[in-house]
Swiss-Prot record:
Protein name in UniProt: Eukaryotic translation initiation factor 3 subunit E
Gene Ontology CC annotations of this record: chromatin; cytoplasm; cytosol; eukaryotic 43S preinitiation complex; eukaryotic 48S preinitiation complex; eukaryotic translation initiation factor 3 complex; eukaryotic translation initiation factor 3 complex, eIF3e; extracellular exosome
GO molecular function: cadherin binding; RNA binding; translation initiation factor activity
Region Sufficient for interaction with TRIM27: start-end pairs: 9-195
Family under the similarity heading: Belongs to the eIF-3 subunit E family.
Organism ancestry: Eukaryota, Metazoa, Chordata, Craniata, Vertebrata
Any one Pfam family match given in the protein's UniProt record, by short name: eIF3_N
Record region (Sufficient for interaction with EPAS1): 4-128
Region described as Sufficient for interaction with MCM7: 351-445
UniProt xrefs under SUPFAM superfamilies: Winged helix' DNA-binding domain (SSF46785)
GO biological process: formation of cytoplasmic translation initiation complex; negative regulation of translational initiation; nuclear-transcribed mRNA catabolic process, nonsense-mediated decay; positive regulation of mRNA binding; positive regulation of translation; regulation of translational initiation; translational initiation
Amino acid sequence: MAEYDLTTRIAHFLDRHLVFPLLEFLSVKEIYNEKELLQGKLDLLSDTNMVDFAMDVYKNLYSDDIPHALREKRTTVVAQLKQLQAETEPIVKMFEDPETTRQMQSTRDGRMLFDYLADKHGFRQEYLDTLYRYAKFQYECGNYSGAAEYLYFFRVLVPATDRNALSSLWGKLASEILMQNWDAAMEDLTRLKETIDNNSVSSPLQSLQQRTWLIHWSLFVFFNHPKGRDNIIDLFLYQPQYLNAIQTMCPHILRYLTTAVITNKDVRKRRQVLKDLVKVIQQESYTYKDPITEFVECLYVNFDFDGAQKKLRECESVLVNDFFLVACLEDFIENARLFIFETFCRIHQCISINMLADKLNMTPEEAERWIVNLIRNARLDAKIDSKLGHVVMGNNAVSPYQQVIEKTKSLSFRSQMLAMNIEKKLNQNSRSEAPNWATQDSGFY
């Protein structure tokens, strides 16, 4: 379903190496013309050192011989790699020393570690630049494990003020993502977020752009790490600076936030978060909507159950064709069906199983078994009257204390939204003038 494909929008905020998995996914799904995708890969590869990959793509795209320029580039890349390997070899040997490894594990101060290496191995300041250039070259060649290793060495030695410090964090995160090391990627994502949030040198506009990049890169981590669907809610919905970035620069990210909320396994948290999510979706509906956000609107704003059922069928097609969300399909459909059921029952309080079966597109027997399993697994507060064929929803009283907490949360959230709206209006004038952060000479972009 090309209509709802977000690859082009998302790719604008990704390093070119991170776009390749998305193009491979689209190729399998056959959403676009295969030749167009191959040409897209070839264009992306033109500014990398993955020459063998580029040659393979060229062979699949054209019937003629490999261009001479590509063969020459391969020779140049191999020569550069050998030269950088020779320059870096003595540095790598220092890090292979067992005592150096122990020092790196026990010393958190980069300056102390640098002094140790200088005393024991004659380490010099210019070695840091050599290490960084070699790591970047390895990354451009597609050797992400080598890049991650050397960027780790670089990171532990340089201060946060180093001109390549921030760039090395982006490179390390990209390398771990491309190797699918999700625990390491989550650590790098957290470290990079802290660096961006604590950066007092960047202008507000630069910080906004950096957060927008981080939001898009984080999708790889959040939808693959076991704790990702909790972390994405905390970051995207409850941290004002990141919610502001989504509303200002990339409202399409609401698709991923909404999916994370719907598929969250914590029922109590999910219900509270839904209230806050609905407010954001309503507010941004004029800038972005798709079947996933419209499903929430139909169900929780308009109470349009027929519309929600229709959108749910469309959601299935969207999820199947989305690189980040395809693995969420089963959880999404199951929980969405539960939301329809709960909302319908709360409005009517008591409802016949036959009517529910009709709403859920099930037979009465299937619907009754499904409801029994929900009650048994403590996912639903309800009782079944088998004689009358009715489902009666429970009515849990909310304590005054809990009511105060909910009201306070609501007020706090609305205050944040008001502040963001003011900031959003101020930023709109400068948005079109914002430079593309990817074009800055900062290393890994």
